[in-house]
Amino acid sequence: MNKNKIVLAYSGGLDTSVAIAWLKKDFDVIAVCMDVGEGKDLQFIHEKALKIGAIESYVIDVKEEFAEAFVLPALQAHAFYEQKYPLVSALSRPLISKKLVDIAHECGATYIAHGCTGKGNDQVRFEIAIAALDPTIEVIAPVRDWHWSREEEIAFAKENGVPIPADLDNPYSVDQNLWGRANECGVLENPWNQAPEEAYDMTVSPEEAPDRPEYIDITFEAGVPIALNGKVLSLANLIIELNQIAGAHGIGRIDHVENRLVGIKSREIYECPGAITLLAAHKEIEDLTFVREVSHFKPILENELSNLIYNGLWYNPATQAILSYLKETQKVVNGIAKVKLYKGHVQVVARQSDNSLYDENLATYTSADSFDQEAAIGFIKLWGLPTQVNAQVNKKGVV
């Protein structure tokens, strides 16, 4: 009897490995793993999926697409959820969903499965994205639906010949891509516990970072970082290199108690050395090149966009409309930011741009000053006129 095909988002971990063994009883399982920049060799995942029982197994390198189509808009939007979290995991989910749907179409599959639990954000992100891309596809979430304990999963794995991951005793749950690393669980679940050094991987402790600062130049063209210290790189490779450089100085550690979409609070440890450095540099070039009105209005949309992405609404029309506006603003974001990295701190210490709106002759207090100070008298009178009229009408007799 021919089975229906199901495309599984496969990580190689216990949950999705057990899912293959479970699903293959009723489906032909097609395992798909996306390389979004974990920095690991994922070939073993391809072989493991086939060994467990998948009929096909894909490992797809999507680092460049992830950087260009998802990370870049977030960088240009200065996207921080709750002003702290640069949306590390949230940014990869719409791309992973898109690839799952594409492969489902290619293989004639009408089902997609993921390994998310029922209390996280990712189940929402995957299922809403898949529904937006193809509402006819049915999504199955084995881990959420089983209600199995960890012990029951391990027992099932042993009974069915599923390899047990070597790091099963690791107390942490980690997700990593180009844009950073997210870590939760274990001792981190108590917000009073300081995160131990073992919870970090991409960054050195700021106390152990070099005693001398390092200066780097980041070049932007139409809002896109195109070169690091004068060396032109693809966006993905620039981020990878910057992760190494900034991570060595303890840059990008974030300890955040955040409000999850599903209604609970979660304590997360993030490491985003490249992201935090790029975000600081990009903001400074914007400050140099934007007119005041764009500088003041853009953050309103940035905050709304951050919430939309975090909440799994990348493919919502509101998200796409905001992204279109933000892309339009980037035409003038050209220049070089000189960044100082020192013991966990990022500081842009110099910047230049051919589109700079900073006029030194207008800003100076020296004899080279070209600002017409006499014009200020009339400006103040007109600017303050509504306030003056209000006082004359409504504050009579007020001391």
Curated annotation (Swiss-Prot):
Associated pathway: Amino-acid biosynthesis; L-arginine biosynthesis; L-arginine from L-ornithine and carbamoyl phosphate: step 2/3
A Pfam family hit: Arginosuc_syn_C
Catalytic activity: L-citrulline + L-aspartate + ATP = 2-(N(omega)-L-arginino)succinate + AMP + diphosphate + H(+)
Binding site for ATP: 9-17, 115
Protein name according to UniProt: Argininosuccinate synthase
Classification of source organism: Bacteria, Bacillati, Bacillota, Bacilli, Lactobacillales
UniProt keyword Cytoplasm present: yes
HAMAP family documented for this protein: Arg_succ_synth_type1
GO MF annotations in UniProt: argininosuccinate synthase activity; ATP binding
Family, as annotated: Belongs to the argininosuccinate synthase family. Type 1 subfamily.
